[in-house]
């Protein structure tokens, strides 16, 4: 059957594209794998079975403490990372799993906890870093090597679990903060946004320092998102949790 042959052909081409995506470059992302039925005018999208049907960043509201971030991993490739958090009665301990011996990643998560201890009262008077213990599990969803851009996602995850508030749905957290709260803009913004789109993100939390780079992003890609700018670490937390 002609349709079956077409689907197999598109599957094979899609696999080639997935390999080329690992080399980077917008030209490998901007490819439509669909066909239109001339009788019904219905468009059918073709994916590859091994990728599954679900998006890495799911629809709907996540659990408090669950955060998705998109950035460059240790291998140099851009991918999606998931943080899942727990809060227990305790005395202010912060444990992390999933980071192994990655020193840069651990330092970034330490930065977040230190920032929360110093500035938590500016976010909420109910945040406690002395009477609770926190555990965050970090997951490299695409096996590209853990990112070191984890301070801001960790801060948001800690505040989310501490306040019992989930992040807004289909949100990808972009950008990073230093120990002083200085915002660090997103490198290679167009490619990062393309990965966000491929992964199911519909809302993008973006530092205002990256606003000037939006000119490098194709209009079609920009139109796929609700861009939410933040101008400080605290502002990023409020907007990630949907608090005005």
Report the location of each language-model feature:
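Amphipathic, interface-forming alpha-helical segments with heptad-repeat character
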Residues: 1-3
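Short, non-transmembrane amphipathic alpha-helical segments
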Residues: 8-24, 116
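The conserved phosphate-sensing helix
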Residues: 5-9, 42
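Peripheral, non-AAA+ core regions of ATP-driven protein-machinery
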Residues: 36-244
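A short amphipathic beta-strand at an alpha->beta junction
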Residues: 17-35, 133-136
């Amino acid at each position: 059957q002609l349709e079956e042959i077409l689907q197999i052909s598109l599957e094979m081409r899609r696999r080639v594209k997935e390999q080329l995506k690992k080399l980077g470059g917008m030209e490998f992302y901007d490819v439509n794998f669909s066909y239109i039925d001339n009788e019904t005018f219905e468009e059918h999208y073709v994916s590859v079975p091994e990728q599954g049907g679900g998006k890495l960043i799911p629809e709907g509201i996540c659990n408090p403490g669950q955060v998705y971030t998109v950035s460059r991993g240790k291998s140099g490739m851009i991918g999606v990372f998931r943080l899942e958090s727990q809060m227990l009665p305790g005395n202010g301990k912060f444990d992390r799993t999933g980071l192994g011996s990655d020193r840069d990643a651990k330092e970034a998560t330490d930065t977040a906890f230190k920032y929360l201890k110093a500035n938590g009262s500016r976010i909420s008077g109910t945040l406690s870093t002395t009477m609770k213990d926190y555990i965050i599990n970090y997951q490299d969803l695409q096996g590209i090597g853990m990112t070191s851009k984890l301070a801001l996602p960790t801060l948001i995850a800690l505040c989310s679990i501490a306040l019992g508030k989930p992040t807004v749905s289909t949100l990808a957290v972009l950008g990073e903060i230093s120990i002083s709260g200085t915002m660090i803009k997103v490198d290679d913004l167009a490619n990062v946004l393309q990965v966000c789109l491929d992964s199911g993100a519909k809302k993008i939390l973006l530092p205002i320092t990256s606003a000037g780079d939006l000119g490098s992003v194709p209009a079609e890609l920009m139109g796929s998102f609700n861009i939410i700018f933040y101008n400080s670490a605290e502002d990023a937390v409020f907007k990630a949790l949907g608090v005005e």
